[in-house]
Amino acid sequence: TSGEAPDVISLGLEAVNMAVSNDLLVPLDDIITDDEELTAKKDQYAPSLLEGFTVNDSLYGLPNGTQTMVVYYNKHMFDEAGLEYPQDGWTWDQFRETAEKLTKDGVYGFCFPCTYFQLTPWWSTNNAALVGEDGETPTVNSEGIVEAVDFLNGMYKDGICPEPISSDGYTMFANNQVAMVGAGRWVLNTWQDAGLTNDDFDCVQWPVK
């Protein structure tokens, strides 16, 4: 309403705490409570989605979409290796063992590009985060973060994963150069355009520590 800046913006979930701590957002609780349509809209969301936009018991946003990171796997490569398809609830150790068995000449078991969304699930499944609950204190040297980085670095050093900085895991997956890759639903159209179908791949929950 100031005429000088947007009243509504779109933020990634990872930016909410930072925006609140810098006084860039205002709580929406009273606005939503006073509006029947917004109240009905809010009630449609799963509580777990709203938690990501809640800071100090105040709600600062409503999701306009969601992307759940999963592990996509090449079904044909699993079949050729004589491996069962992974199941929800598998562990880091089971994941590494599977990726190692899928690695052969010209094919990597897994690819993890060095992007925030690719790395976050690893420390999230190890009960860790880059910043403390106050949204300000860095925790990059915490045990959970270090353990996750060491785990990934070990797979790279052992040749299970390609070089993470320059590798395009999604293209490599479509070209049968990598057996597993982490992603959300955004990659599906790209793979469809590349000719992949549901017969070629499936997905499973991220492995847990």
Model segments located where?
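Short glycine- and hydrophobic/aromatic-rich loop-to-beta-strand nucleating segment
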Residues: 70-73
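Short helix-initiation/N-cap motifs at beta->coil->alpha
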Residues: 1, 14, 90-96, 162-175
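Bilobed periplasmic-binding protein-like "clamshell/Venus-flytrap" ligand-binding domains
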Residues: 60-61, 103-114
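Paired acidic/hydrophobic, glycine-rich loop segments that form the ligand-binding mouth/hinge
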Residues: 7-10, 179-183
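Early extracytoplasmic/lumenal segment of secretory-pathway proteins
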Residues: 1-16, 105
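Hinge/lid segment of periplasmic solute-binding proteins
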Residues: 12-68, 96, 202-204
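Glycine-centered hinge/linker elements that transmit conformational signals in sensory
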Residues: 98-101, 135-164, 205-206
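A ligand-binding cleft/hinge motif common to bilobed small-molecule-binding domains
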Residues: 16-20, 185-198
